[in-house]
Amino acid sequence: YKIELKKNKGTWRGQRTINLNKHMTEGMRFRNKLAYDLLKGIPQLISLRTQFVHLYVKDTTDGSADAEFEDYGLYTQVEQLNKTGLKNHGLDSNGQLYKINSFEFYRYEDVIKLQDDPSYDSAAFEKLLEIKGSTDHRKLIQMLEAVNDYSIPIDTVLEEYFNEENITYWMGF
């Protein structure tokens, strides 16, 4: 479930978006939370805040005021990584942040374009990468062009566009 609290109606633990994950195929229901908790101990990586939630729902959509709470079971609440999440973790809330839907470090010149390009198609772009931060895609495009330019040594590309320590820790995790 994704619960959005209305603007100017307050927050829950500093969050307006509350994500509740069930993990029905994971019998123990704790691996996802364990992974986030383990990441907290690695300063070179970012981890989202999580907690277990035992969810009860009272459905009053039919107008019945005497509905009973129904036990929906155990969920993991995971912090939403968005502009607020970036700020909460000491990062630039106006920085580039993308949710990867389908991505392989290809340039995809027909889709990944600057927003002011007349042929820019937001829906096509977000089919690959959902924009969760700044809509300025210049850094993304520069990095993709460098990664796909085989005349540039990969060490140069890594040094210019990536944090080697971060990548090393991520691969080790």
How would you label these PLM feature ranges?
Residues 1-173:
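Phosphate/dinucleotide-binding and metal-coordinating scaffold of catalytic cores
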